[in-house]
Amino acid sequence: MTNRPPPDGSNRPIQLSSEAALDALCADADRVLVEFYTDGCGICSSMEPVLGNLARQLDIAVAQVNPRDDPPLVERFDVRSVPLFVLFVDGDPVARLADGFVPGAELESWVREHSG
């Protein structure tokens, strides 16, 4: 397995539109950080550059998914508030964080702590 940047070569988060797309990405990458967000969430929008920087610094796949696009995601990941960050290692969710805006250094430490 490998981590891969988005197809356009940027470090912007990969936009996922379904549970199947999320599962495929998690199966394909060693480590994946997913932000669950909703349209109109200002904090969620402000996290995008932080996530892009994190992808570059940690060589990790970073994605965003709106659970409203695929409602079973809400139940599967117990999404109660956004942004919700879920870290996957080898396809399995290993940690979750739902603390609003998370500064880059804090999010980087959290990813390192939970991904070995």
Model-found features: residue ranges?
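Short active-site neighborhood of thiol/selenol oxidoreductases, capturing the structured segment around
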Residues: A27-D39
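Haloarchaeal acidic low-complexity proteome signature biased toward cell-envelope/secretome components but also
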Residues: M1-D28, L107-G116
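Typically the conserved alpha-helix immediately C-terminal to a functionally engaged Cys/Sec
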Residues: I43-L58
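The canonical Cys-X-X-Cys-His
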Residues: C41-C44, F85
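Structural micro-motif
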Residues: F77-V86
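Hydrophobic beta-strand anchors of alpha/beta hydrolase catalytic cores
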Residues: L33-V34, V62, F85
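Structural microenvironment flanking redox-active thiols in thiol-disulfide oxidoreductases
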Residues: P67-L73
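Non-catalytic, surface beta->alpha helical segment in thiol-disulfide oxidoreductase systems
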Residues: V86-G116
